[in-house]
Amino acid sequence: IQDGVIVNYYESVQLVTRLKAELEERLGVELPYAAAAIPPGVSEGSVKSIGYVLEGAGFEVTNIVDEPTAAAAVLKITDGAVVDVGGGTTGISILKDGKVIYTDDEATGGSHMTMTVAGHYRIPYEEAEVLKTTPEKEKEIFPVIKATVEKMASITEKFLKGYEIPAVYVVGGSASFQEFTSVFEKKLNLPVYRPVHPLLVTPLGIAYNCQLPQKAH
Protein backbone atom coordinates (compact mmCIF):
# COMPACT_ATOMS: atom_id res chain seq x y z
CA ILE A 1 0.00 0.00 0.00
CA GLN A 2 1.35 3.44 -0.94
CA ASP A 3 -0.38 6.69 0.04
CA GLY A 4 -3.50 4.69 0.92
CA VAL A 5 -3.68 3.00 -2.49
CA ILE A 6 -3.11 -0.70 -3.25
CA VAL A 7 0.03 -1.17 -5.36
CA ASN A 8 0.51 -4.93 -4.86
CA TYR A 9 -2.78 -6.81 -4.67
CA TYR A 10 -1.35 -10.28 -4.00
CA GLU A 11 0.91 -9.20 -1.12
CA SER A 12 -1.88 -7.06 0.35
CA VAL A 13 -4.27 -10.03 0.42
CA GLN A 14 -1.61 -12.21 2.05
CA LEU A 15 -0.91 -9.57 4.70
CA VAL A 16 -4.56 -8.95 5.59
CA THR A 17 -5.28 -12.71 5.63
CA ARG A 18 -2.43 -13.26 8.08
CA LEU A 19 -3.49 -10.38 10.33
CA LYS A 20 -7.11 -11.61 10.29
CA ALA A 21 -6.02 -15.10 11.37
CA GLU A 22 -3.75 -13.76 14.11
CA LEU A 23 -6.46 -11.51 15.52
CA GLU A 24 -9.14 -14.21 15.39
CA GLU A 25 -6.83 -16.56 17.29
CA ARG A 26 -6.03 -13.92 19.88
CA LEU A 27 -9.68 -12.96 20.42
CA GLY A 28 -11.13 -16.44 20.08
CA VAL A 29 -13.88 -15.29 17.70
CA GLU A 30 -14.47 -15.26 13.95
CA LEU A 31 -14.29 -11.85 12.24
CA PRO A 32 -16.53 -12.11 9.15
CA TYR A 33 -17.11 -8.38 8.48
CA ALA A 34 -14.79 -5.50 7.66
CA ALA A 35 -14.85 -1.84 6.75
CA ALA A 36 -12.03 0.26 5.35
CA ALA A 37 -11.01 3.88 4.92
CA ILE A 38 -9.37 5.62 1.97
CA PRO A 39 -7.66 8.97 1.43
CA PRO A 40 -10.14 11.51 0.03
CA GLY A 41 -10.16 11.87 -3.73
CA VAL A 42 -8.74 8.48 -4.72
CA SER A 43 -10.09 6.90 -7.91
CA GLU A 44 -13.07 4.58 -7.98
CA GLY A 45 -10.75 1.81 -9.13
CA SER A 46 -8.59 2.26 -6.03
CA VAL A 47 -11.66 2.07 -3.80
CA LYS A 48 -12.71 -1.18 -5.48
CA SER A 49 -9.19 -2.58 -5.08
CA ILE A 50 -9.33 -2.11 -1.31
CA GLY A 51 -12.67 -3.91 -1.23
CA TYR A 52 -11.25 -6.74 -3.33
CA VAL A 53 -8.33 -7.15 -0.92
CA LEU A 54 -10.69 -7.49 2.04
CA GLU A 55 -12.86 -9.96 0.16
CA GLY A 56 -9.76 -11.90 -0.88
CA ALA A 57 -8.83 -12.18 2.80
CA GLY A 58 -12.21 -13.71 3.64
CA PHE A 59 -14.15 -10.65 4.82
CA GLU A 60 -17.60 -9.44 3.84
CA VAL A 61 -17.10 -5.72 3.15
CA THR A 62 -19.77 -3.57 4.78
CA ASN A 63 -18.49 -0.05 4.10
CA ILE A 64 -15.62 2.01 2.69
CA VAL A 65 -15.38 5.60 3.92
CA ASP A 66 -12.82 8.36 3.52
CA GLU A 67 -10.37 8.72 6.40
CA PRO A 68 -11.25 12.22 7.71
CA THR A 69 -14.96 11.38 7.66
CA ALA A 70 -14.24 8.25 9.70
CA ALA A 71 -12.40 10.41 12.22
CA ALA A 72 -15.27 12.90 12.35
CA ALA A 73 -17.63 10.10 13.43
CA VAL A 74 -15.49 9.51 16.52
CA LEU A 75 -15.03 13.19 17.35
CA LYS A 76 -18.78 13.79 16.87
CA ILE A 77 -18.16 16.94 14.86
CA THR A 78 -21.08 18.64 13.13
CA ASP A 79 -19.31 21.81 11.96
CA GLY A 80 -15.61 22.20 11.24
CA ALA A 81 -12.75 20.56 9.38
CA VAL A 82 -11.08 17.25 10.19
CA VAL A 83 -7.50 16.97 8.95
CA ASP A 84 -6.11 13.43 8.88
CA VAL A 85 -2.32 13.36 8.56
CA GLY A 86 -1.62 9.85 7.35
CA GLY A 87 1.54 8.07 6.35
CA GLY A 88 1.55 9.41 2.81
CA THR A 89 -1.15 12.08 2.58
CA THR A 90 -2.82 14.98 4.35
CA GLY A 91 -6.58 14.60 3.91
CA ILE A 92 -9.47 16.83 4.91
CA SER A 93 -13.22 16.62 5.37
CA ILE A 94 -15.24 19.79 5.91
CA LEU A 95 -18.55 19.33 7.72
CA LYS A 96 -21.56 21.61 7.99
CA ASP A 97 -24.68 20.73 9.99
CA GLY A 98 -23.37 17.19 10.37
CA LYS A 99 -22.89 16.59 6.64
CA VAL A 100 -19.62 16.30 4.72
CA ILE A 101 -19.59 19.09 2.12
CA TYR A 102 -15.99 18.77 0.88
CA THR A 103 -13.13 16.27 0.90
CA ASP A 104 -9.65 16.35 -0.60
CA ASP A 105 -6.09 15.24 0.04
CA GLU A 106 -2.53 15.90 -1.04
CA ALA A 107 0.59 13.74 -0.95
CA THR A 108 2.42 15.02 2.10
CA GLY A 109 2.33 12.91 5.26
CA GLY A 110 4.28 11.14 7.95
CA SER A 111 6.56 9.37 5.47
CA HIS A 112 7.77 12.78 4.27
CA MET A 113 8.63 13.67 7.87
CA THR A 114 10.62 10.46 8.14
CA MET A 115 12.50 11.16 4.90
CA THR A 116 13.38 14.62 6.22
CA VAL A 117 14.76 13.09 9.43
CA ALA A 118 16.70 10.49 7.43
CA GLY A 119 18.25 13.18 5.25
CA HIS A 120 19.08 15.45 8.16
CA TYR A 121 20.87 12.77 10.17
CA ARG A 122 22.06 10.76 7.16
CA ILE A 123 20.55 7.56 8.49
CA PRO A 124 18.39 4.81 6.89
CA TYR A 125 14.65 5.41 6.58
CA GLU A 126 13.78 2.67 9.09
CA GLU A 127 16.11 4.16 11.69
CA ALA A 128 14.68 7.61 11.05
CA GLU A 129 11.14 6.30 11.62
CA VAL A 130 12.15 4.93 15.02
CA LEU A 131 13.83 8.23 15.91
CA LYS A 132 10.79 10.24 14.79
CA THR A 133 8.39 8.19 16.90
CA THR A 134 10.49 8.14 20.08
CA PRO A 135 8.75 10.52 22.56
CA GLU A 136 12.00 11.34 24.37
CA LYS A 137 13.44 12.70 21.09
CA GLU A 138 10.50 14.96 20.26
CA LYS A 139 12.15 18.28 21.22
CA GLU A 140 15.17 17.39 19.10
CA ILE A 141 13.19 16.09 16.12
CA PHE A 142 10.42 18.67 15.76
CA PRO A 143 12.65 21.53 14.57
CA VAL A 144 13.92 19.17 11.85
CA ILE A 145 10.43 18.38 10.55
CA LYS A 146 8.80 21.75 11.26
CA ALA A 147 9.00 22.83 7.61
CA THR A 148 7.09 19.69 6.62
CA VAL A 149 4.40 20.45 9.20
CA GLU A 150 4.20 24.01 7.85
CA LYS A 151 3.63 22.55 4.38
CA MET A 152 0.79 20.43 5.78
CA ALA A 153 -0.70 23.59 7.29
CA SER A 154 -0.40 25.34 3.91
CA ILE A 155 -2.16 22.43 2.23
CA THR A 156 -4.96 22.71 4.79
CA GLU A 157 -5.18 26.47 4.25
CA LYS A 158 -5.63 25.85 0.51
CA PHE A 159 -8.38 23.30 1.16
CA LEU A 160 -10.24 25.71 3.46
CA LYS A 161 -10.45 28.60 0.98
CA GLY A 162 -14.06 29.59 0.45
CA TYR A 163 -15.33 27.84 3.58
CA GLU A 164 -16.17 29.41 6.92
CA ILE A 165 -15.52 26.97 9.75
CA PRO A 166 -15.30 27.39 13.53
CA ALA A 167 -12.32 25.08 14.15
CA VAL A 168 -9.93 22.47 12.77
CA TYR A 169 -9.40 19.02 14.30
CA VAL A 170 -6.15 17.18 13.52
CA VAL A 171 -5.78 13.40 13.77
CA GLY A 172 -3.27 10.77 12.68
CA GLY A 173 -0.02 9.62 14.23
CA SER A 174 1.96 12.43 12.62
CA ALA A 175 -0.11 14.96 14.57
CA SER A 176 1.19 13.58 17.88
CA PHE A 177 3.95 16.18 18.24
CA GLN A 178 3.06 18.68 20.96
CA GLU A 179 3.92 21.71 18.80
CA PHE A 180 1.96 20.42 15.79
CA THR A 181 -1.24 22.31 16.60
CA SER A 182 0.55 25.60 17.27
CA VAL A 183 2.07 25.53 13.76
CA PHE A 184 -1.39 24.98 12.28
CA GLU A 185 -2.99 27.69 14.44
CA LYS A 186 -0.38 30.22 13.37
CA LYS A 187 -0.94 29.45 9.69
CA LEU A 188 -4.73 29.11 9.71
CA ASN A 189 -5.64 31.70 12.35
CA LEU A 190 -8.24 29.25 13.66
CA PRO A 191 -8.59 27.12 16.81
CA VAL A 192 -6.90 23.76 16.20
CA TYR A 193 -7.68 20.76 18.40
CA ARG A 194 -5.98 17.39 18.71
CA PRO A 195 -7.47 14.41 20.61
CA VAL A 196 -5.46 12.62 23.28
CA HIS A 197 -4.59 9.67 21.03
CA PRO A 198 -4.65 11.06 17.46
CA LEU A 199 -3.26 7.84 15.97
CA LEU A 200 -6.30 5.82 17.10
CA VAL A 201 -9.11 8.13 15.99
CA THR A 202 -9.40 7.11 12.33
CA PRO A 203 -9.17 3.34 12.99
CA LEU A 204 -11.91 3.68 15.60
CA GLY A 205 -13.96 5.68 13.09
CA ILE A 206 -13.62 2.86 10.56
CA ALA A 207 -15.05 0.47 13.16
CA TYR A 208 -17.91 2.91 13.87
CA ASN A 209 -18.71 2.94 10.15
CA CYS A 210 -18.64 -0.85 9.74
CA GLN A 211 -22.46 -0.99 9.38
CA LEU A 212 -22.99 -4.64 10.32
CA PRO A 213 -25.77 -6.43 8.43
CA GLN A 214 -29.01 -6.79 10.41
CA LYS A 215 -28.44 -10.55 10.74
CA ALA A 216 -25.16 -9.88 12.59
CA HIS A 217 -26.76 -7.92 15.44
Describe each model-derived feature in a short phrase.
Residues 1-85, 97-217:
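Nucleotide/phosphate-binding catalytic cleft detector across ATP-hydrolyzing
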Residues 90-94:
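Short beta-strand scaffold segments in enzyme catalytic cores
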